[in-house]
Amino acid sequence: HISTGDILRAAVKNQTPLGVKAKGFMDAGELVPDDLIIDLMKERIEQPDTEKGVILDGFPRTTTQAVALDTMLAELKRPLNAALLIDVDFEVIVKRLTSRRMCKECGHIGSVADAACPACGGEMYQRDDDNEATVRNRLDVYEKSTAPLIDYYRGCDLLVSIDGDRDVDVVYADVKQALGL
């Protein structure tokens, strides 16, 4: 599992050149420019631990990124098996993300109801980009930049749509089934 968000947050925390460039976009809820993300993902996808397959989380987010991914995978002679759309009502997304909390110690994702991390007992905090204004801006950016990927992957006969408004265990089971796991 490769999460562009995790990679970018680590780059910001470590103040790498990419992290410094990306921070302003992330804090505003904007997409990090395609060229930066494509370079980052190309470097990561070429690592030996991805040879048997990988789940990409947060990439691609634009049609330009999708075309770049197609090129990368063709060069590596690897197929793209599916593009999952976990479909959730925008107001549900706002509620979920603004109540999301993360453990400072182990990175466990929890909710505002968790006073301490259920995994390790560490302190829970709200990520800077999980405030309502930033979440709503991210949804606007999604509509403009990422939603066109639905038609792109439908046209490639790779789109698998999953109803994300259900219990997490049911959604997870559907994701596993869609991926053949």
Give the positions of each predicted feature.
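Conserved phosphate-donor/acceptor-positioning beta-strand/loop module used by diverse small-molecule
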Residues: 57, 76-100, 111-116, 162
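ATP-dependent small-molecule kinase phosphotransfer cores
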Residues: 2-78, 89-92, 127, 134
